[in-house]
Regions:
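Iron-sulfur cluster-binding cysteine motifs and their immediate structural context
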Residues: 207-273
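Extended, non-globular alpha-helical segments
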Residues: 20-34, 38, 111-123, 272
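Active-site-proximal substrate-binding core of FAD-dependent oxidoreductases
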Residues: 16, 48-54, 66-118, 231-236, ...
């Protein structure tokens, strides 16, 4: 996209100073979980408070943090012993502007899952945004999890995309981009990207998806390394490898892995990308 004449004319002469990635929680209103649990609460992006059409969630994150803080203070002052449950946070959330805002746009993202596809979604979303404004008696559902939408390489509609080599001006190679995140993890700590069975994962995923992890990861964490010789690579000719120190915590793997056997967990030392205001 950056090489499109319009965008390249804007970006030319500039300097890339940072890089980052984060998977968007597009579930919206329909996917808000129970936000309180014994001794804690879910706030912000953890609870999925992103306004998907606007791709904005800072304001809802801040508001949910304020609501949780108020509920926490009330719970701690009223209950001096036992487990603290933030029931007041659940109630305050439903009476807040967060709930009202997300409910108003709840049908926009699911509307793209229709027989008319993109065109149908655009038409319905426009109707919702400018006329209906969420004041409808129905709530559209998401058809299924994101990972279930991944097609195998054998599917007729799947074609290989060949991208041009990065020019070092507008586009950059992956390792250069990762270096701009400032990410760092201690090499000797347990891998925080947990795979139930590495060999089984490779046997199951590589023949069907031809190294999907290589393509959806924006930091080069996952690799299928070529291995030749009898008995190597389980007959696939490749070995599944995780470069966890490169991880920038976008959580795409946890969401998109077709077999759902990759689990992102907090690194032992709490490390990760060092983002800063640019």
């Amino acid at each position: 996209m950056k090489h499109h004449p319009f965008f390249s004319s804007v970006l030319s002469g500039g300097k890339c100073i940072s890089y980052g990635a984060r998977a968007l929680n597009e579930g919206g209103f329909q996917s808000i979980p129970k936000v309180s649990f014994p001794g804690g609460a879910l706030i912000g992006d953890t609870a999925g408070f992103l306004n998907v059409p606007k791709i904005k969630g800072t304001h809802t994150s801040m508001k949910s943090g304020m609501l949780a803080a108020e509920a926490t203070y009330a719970a701690l002052t009223e209950n001096t012993s036992g487990t603290v449950m933030l029931y007041a946070y659940e109630d305050a959330l439903r009476a807040s502007t967060i709930w009202k805002e997300l409910k108003q746009v709840r049908n926009m993202r699911p509307s793209f899952h229709n027989p008319l596809g993109l065109i149908g979604g655009v038409l319905y979303s426009g109707l919702e945004a400018y006329i209906l404004k969420g004041r409808v008696p129905w709530t559209l559902k998401h058809p299924g999890p994101d990972h279930a939408a991944t097609l195998p390489v054998s599917h007729p509609s799947v074609r290989k995309i060949t991208y041009p080599k990065p020019d070092g001006i507008l586009s950059f190679d992956l390792l250069t981009s990762v270096s701009r995140t400032g990410t760092n993890h201690e090499e000797d700590q347990p891998v925080h990207l947990r795979v139930k069975d590495w060999r089984a994962h490779a046997r199951r995923e590589f023949p069907r998806f031809d190294g999907l992890e290589n393509r959806f990861c924006p930091a080069g964490v996952y690799e299928y390394v070529e291995e030749e010789g009898e008995g190597k690579g389980d007959g696939l000719g490749v070995r599944f490898q995780i470069n966890a120190q490169n991880c920038i915590h976008c959580k795409t793997c946890d969401i998109k892995a077709p077999s759902q056997d990759i689990e992102w967990s907090t690194p032992q030392g709490g490390e990760g990308p060092k983002y800063y205001m640019t």
